[in-house]
């Protein structure tokens, strides 16, 4: 019984990884708008978090983070903003692309488990799906502002002149 359960989890993990890679390396996963892109790659992350729990969500989130980082250096597509951030600081670009996506998957697993204890699976899945896009956006943009908010590139995007700097409260 335990072997079957582990095999099922491994198959789901592989399937979600494959779907995510397909979406990341084809136009299915991103809708580019200016320097940013709306991503649909959070869908496999949410499904993995719902079906496999926090560890599965974090694993698929890590795959999403890696594909996002690889696009900064032109592997499997390109991200103009990612390339610019990579040229500013490669390590911070990795942190900004990888950590929010992995954290998103981890927290989605916990959110699903928390809501599932209090309601049915349908409502828990609905809440988790909403939180997926919301948390991805919040984590990604927060990391972007915290790590790169005072760079010339970011200041030029939001049209702030050189003497003015963003202050974190």
Language-model-derived ranges and their functions:
Residues 1-63:
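Hydrophobic transmembrane alpha-helices
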Residues 5-16, 38, 42, 93, ...:
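Residue-level signature of transmembrane alpha-helical entry/exit and packing/kink sites
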Residues 24-37, 63-106, 110:
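Interfacial aromatic-anchored transmembrane helix boundaries in multi-pass membrane proteins
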Residues 59-68, 125-132:
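Central hydrophobic cores of alpha-helical transmembrane segments
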Residues 72, 109-113, 137-152:
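Juxtamembrane/transmembrane-helix interface segments of polytopic membrane transporters
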Residues 98, 102, 106, 133-142:
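Mid-bilayer segments of alpha-helical transmembrane spans in multi-pass integral membrane proteins
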Residues 114-138:
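Internal alpha-helical transmembrane segments of multi-pass membrane proteins
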Residues 158-169:
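Single conserved hydrophobic/aromatic residue that forms the stacking wall/gate
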